[in-house]
Design a protein with these regions (language model features):
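Basic side chains
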Residues: 8-9, 71, 157, 244, ...
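Hydrophobic core
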Residues: 15-23
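Residues in and immediately flanking transmembrane alpha helices
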Residues: 21-22, 84, 214, 297
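Bacterial N-terminal signal peptides that target proteins for export
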Residues: 2-14
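Domain-terminus/edge residues, biased toward the C-terminal soluble/receptor-binding domains
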Residues: 163-167, 175-425
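Active-site-adjacent loops and short helices of periplasmic peptidoglycan-processing enzymes
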Residues: 2-3, 27-184, 188-197, 261
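A near-ubiquitous, low-amplitude feature marking generic local secondary-structure context
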Residues: 12, 35, 43, 106-110, ...
Length: 425
């Protein structure tokens, strides 16, 4: 009995340590890459956005130039600033040199002009839909008071999110030198952005019409630079909800995408990709994720999960079963494990279906849920059984003794009558 308890405790301790170790390694990829990327230096990070679980990782912790993916942090700080998105901003003269630098670098713009008054929501659409660098700089000035102070805010926010390989030097990513991050860090930033419904709506827009302003008499239609949200593109996927792309000569092609299907969400980051292969790889990796992971039964109510010792009962230990089935979402190769919360032993009598403890169910180290553990049989205490047997034996002996007494008395009475008859004769 002692050995059984010892081994169960040891197994529970090992499982707890293993789960803690798994939780401490968020960058550990659980699955091999299903495709060959166009470049060995390409960085890939695919994760389950619902749980944070890493699915695929290739060069995910290596610093890369991130080009316009920088604009995700710019958008996040605007959305977190509390400023009225329908409020207007006037482009300051302080943007004069900034706009010249953007023009000299052949950066994408929304055609903003010094002195132009534009709504913040229009700046946000220009930033995320057409990847306008001038919009990023105006947002930086509006939120931070200056571009330099805004960049400081960007780096501080990245550190708060747990980014360790990120350094921003501008609000748009057009100027590469020193503006670096990792695929894993960009996933952290993107996941925070994805929590904001406005970010999801804006970044998932294929085309947007900016209204006329004081310096633009006509409306301006801006189009997405990313074909993943273009219904007419060969790369279009209906499950993709929002996306941000980027490109510079040093950064190569970059993309962040979020995809939802069947109640499950994945986030994907690709850095330093080939121009011809980026969107094909995005589709292939997200298609693979939805095809390879599914909801499946993990625990039924008829399979023994563990046992518990009984006291005052010779029939021990007793098997324990899940009180209800448990299902989970994962890969076919994912291993199911348990952490039990049980007493060392329980006293008999035990009823059929009696709750004894609980089991926390894990799939590939990630918690799925907790279920009650119950018995599937009835056990009666040996003390009660022995007491009943003793009482029955005593009753039987009393009856037998009583019967013998009656017989003895009856036999004695017959002999007395016989002697009386003989005396009369």
């Amino acid at each position: 009995m002692f050995q059984n308890r010892f081994f169960r405790r040891a197994a529970a301790l090992v499982l707890t340590l293993a789960l803690a170790a798994a939780a401490a390694l968020p960058g550990l990829a659980a699955y091999p890459m299903p495709i060959q990327t166009a470049s060995e230096t390409e960085a890939v990070y695919l994760f389950n956005a619902d749980t944070g679980k890493t699915i695929l990782a290739q060069n995910a912790d290596q610093q890369q130039y991130v080009a316009s993916l920088t604009k995700m942090m710019t958008a996040l700080l605007l959305l977190e600033s509390g400023k009225d998105l329908n409020g207007e901003v006037t482009v300051p003269t302080a943007m004069t040199q900034e706009f010249k630098d953007i023009q000299n670098a052949n950066g994408m713009t929304a055609g903003l002009r010094i002195g132009e008054t534009v709504r913040r929501i229009d700046l946000l659409y220009a930033l995320l839909v057409s990847s306008a660098n001038d919009a990023a700089s105006v947002i930086a000035y509006d939120v931070g008071g200056s571009v330099l102070d805004f960049v400081r805010q960007m780096n501080a926010r990245a550190a708060e999110l747990g980014c360790t390989g990120t350094n921003f030097t501008c609000a748009h990513g057009l100027f590469d030198y020193g503006n670096v991050s990792t695929a894993e860090d960009m996933a952290r930033i993107a996941a925070e952005c994805y929590k904001n419904p406005t970010f999801v709506q804006v970044s998932g827009t294929a085309a947007y019409t900016m209204p006329a302003t004081n310096l633009h008499q006509n409306e301006r239609t801006i189009n997405s630079t990313n074909p993943l949200t273009d219904t007419g593109s060969e790369f279009y996927r209906s499950y993709i909800k929002c996306v941000k792309g980027g490109f510079t000569t040093l950064a190569g092609r970059c993309a962040v995408a979020f995809a939802e299907q069947g109640g499950h969400t994945y986030g994907l980051v690709i850095l330093h990709a080939d121009n011809a292969s980026l969107y094909t790889e995005c589709d292939q990796l997200l298609d693979w994720a939805f095809e390879s992971f599914s909801d499946r039964p993990l625990v039924d109510t008829q399979t023994e999960l563990t046992t518990v010792d009984l006291t005052k009962c010779r029939a021990q230990p007793t098997a324990l079963y899940a009180a209800a089935p448990v299902s989970g979402y994962g890969h076919a190769d994912d291993v199911v494990s348990y952490a039990f919360d049980l007493p060392e032993s329980i006293p008999a009598t035990v009823k059929n279906g009696q709750k004894v403890g609980t089991a926390t169910v894990y799939l590939d180290g990630y918690e799925v849920g907790t279920v009650d553990l119950v018995t599937h049989a009835e056990y009666i205490s040996d003390f009660r059984t022995d007491s009943k047997a003793t009482l029955l034996l005593l009753c039987t002996l009393v009856v037998i003794l009583g019967a013998l007494t009656v017989l003895t008395l009856a036999a004695g009475g017959g002999s007395l009558n016989l002697r009386r008859r003989k005396r009369r004769h």
